[in-house]
């Protein structure tokens, strides 16, 4: 069974834990209890393939930022979460993305942009803004509500699909490189 290491990143209070717990336990946690770091595992079937999701729910608070490099190193894919009623959390996404790319030493890291709390009427981040940002990054965008469960499965499953595409691309690139190294030389 394939295991996928997913990491949920974003500013404090955007609902990273609420999304993760909604996926894992099917219930909404409405009290805010800042996370230091929590790990969850769940077996799911995505596109007919049974797989194990190993999800790391991370601290959004700045005082835990030193831990970020470590979990970013081990993650295969990242849910970059902001709250649709918090413009600052949306602006912070750029910093998380840059840090992920730096730590992974790659421009091409599987990510999904997630606009959480879409059940709230007090939107400050327009859907089009988020779609434009995701398009500029070349990643999918999904609006979610941990409260109503809207888009929760879709966000995590889309990330798994992005990881699969990435792995497939990497193995094709690897085969191309191997073929290139098998050139024969003649010494005269």
From Swiss-Prot:
CDD domains cross-referenced by the UniProt entry: H_N_K_Ras_like
UniProt motif Effector region: location: 32-40
Compartments (UniProt record): Cell membrane; Cytoplasm
Keywords, in A-Z order: Cell membrane, Cytoplasm, GTP-binding, Hydrolase, Lipoprotein, Membrane, Methylation, Nucleotide-binding, Prenylation
Catalyses which reaction(s): GTP + H2O = GDP + phosphate + H(+)
GO molecular function: G protein activity; GTP binding
GO BP: signal transduction
Binding site for GTP: 10-18, 29-35, 59-60, 116-119
Main location: membrane
InterPro entries to which the protein is assigned, alphabetical: P-loop_NTPase, Small_GTP-bd, Small_GTPase, Small_GTPase_Ras-type
Membrane topology: Lipid-anchor
Propeptide: 186-188
In-chain residues carrying the UniProt-annotated modification Cysteine methyl ester: 185
Covalent lipid sites (S-farnesyl cysteine): 185
One cellular component term from this protein's GO annotations in UniProt: cytoplasmic side of plasma membrane
Notes on activation and inhibition: Alternates between an inactive form bound to GDP and an active form bound to GTP. Activated by a guanine nucleotide-exchange factor (GEF) and inactivated by a GTPase-activating protein (GAP).
Pfam families registered for this protein in UniProt: Ras
Residue ranges, annotated region (Disordered): 168-188
EC number assigned by the record: 3.6.5.2
Family statement: Belongs to the small GTPase superfamily. Ras family.
Cited function: Ras proteins bind GDP/GTP and possess intrinsic GTPase activity. Plays an important role in the regulation of cell proliferation. May play a role in promoting oncogenic events by inducing transcriptional silencing of tumor suppressor genes (TSGs).
Protein name, as recorded: GTPase KRas
Lineage: Eukaryota, Metazoa, Chordata, Craniata, Vertebrata
Gene: KRAS
């Amino acid at each position: 069974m394939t295991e996928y290491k997913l990491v949920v990143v974003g500013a404090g209070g955007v609902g990273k834990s609420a999304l993760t717990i909604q996926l894992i336990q099917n219930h909404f946690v409405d009290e805010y209890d800042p996370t230091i770091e929590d790990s969850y595992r769940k077996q799911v079937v995505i596109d007919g393939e049974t797989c194990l999701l190993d999800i790391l729910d991370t601290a959004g608070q700045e005082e835990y930022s030193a831990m970020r490099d470590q979990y970013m190193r081990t993650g295969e894919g990242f849910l970059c979460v902001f709250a649709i009623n918090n413009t600052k959390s949306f602006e912070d996404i750029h910093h998380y993305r840059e840090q992920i790319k730096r730590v992974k030493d790659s421009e091409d890291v599987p990510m999904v942009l997630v606009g959480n709390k879409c059940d709230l009427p007090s939107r400050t981040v327009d859907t089009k803004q988020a779609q434009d940002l995701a398009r500029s990054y070349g990643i999918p965008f999904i609006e979610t509500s941990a409260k109503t469960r809207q888009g929760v499965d879709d966000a995590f499953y889309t990330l798994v699909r992005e990881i699969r595409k990435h792995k497939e691309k990497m193995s094709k690139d690897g085969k191309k490189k191997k073929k290139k190294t098998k050139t024969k030389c003649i010494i005269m």
